[in-house]
Amino acid sequence: MPFALRYHPAVRGDDLPLIDRKTRERIRGAIEERLRTAPHEYGEPLRKTLKGYWKLRVGDYRVVFKVIKSDVLILGIRHRKSVYTDISTRLQP
């Protein structure tokens, strides 16, 4: 059963415009191929403040997501140097 992909509004507004087109297509392909079919097999669980969330590595970029039943909520796509601090600010109320 394929998972439905949902994106945080900041992914399209803030994250994707910062990534060059070739890398963006590579990330999109990885999301479609891996997260839509088996997110727990391809992703790695995060710890500490991001416990309950997962990451998918695509080159120097990280896709941070959460699996909720049959949905995959993608919270951010950022360079590995800044992804975790940027995502943590999105989770604060």
List each model region and its residues.
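Arg/Lys-rich, positively charged N-terminal/basic patches that mediate binding to nucleic acids
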Residues: 1-29
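Enriched for short, Lys/Arg-rich terminal
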Residues: 2-4, 25, 58, 66-93
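Residue-level recognition of oxygen-bearing side chains
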Residues: 10, 51, 82
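Active-site micro-motifs of SAM-dependent methyltransferase domains
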Residues: 13, 37, 82
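A short, surface-exposed loop/turn module that caps and links secondary-structure elements
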Residues: 32-57, 85
